[in-house]
Amino acid sequence: MRRRNARGGISRTVSVYLDEDTNNRLIRAKDRSGRSKTIEVQIRLRDHLKRFPDFYNEEIFREVIEENESTFKEL
């Protein structure tokens, strides 16, 4: 579903399943910040992706592929 967001662009909707501990941490964080749960998730996800843009490092990924003798030669 496409919606306009506060930044003026088109946003996308994502659904996730959270374990109880993660959900409780998220609720406590949103209560402390005064934001909605949705906005808290959006801010935290954006921050994580900025700080860890290459979370699955290509070099490590290649090592795993070679170790498992995968048919994939390149990413």
Swiss-Prot record:
InterPro entries: TraY (IPR008876)
GO molecular function, one term: DNA binding
Protein transport as UniProt keyword: no
UniProt feature coiled coil, ranges: none
Localization, UniProt: Cytoplasm
Domain of life: Bacteria
Subunit relationships: Part of the relaxosome, a complex composed of plasmid encoded TraI, TraM, TraY and host-encoded IHF bound to the F plasmid origin of transfer (oriT). Interacts with TraM, probably through its C-terminus.
Protein name: Relaxosome protein TraY
Gene name, Swiss-Prot/TrEMBL: traY
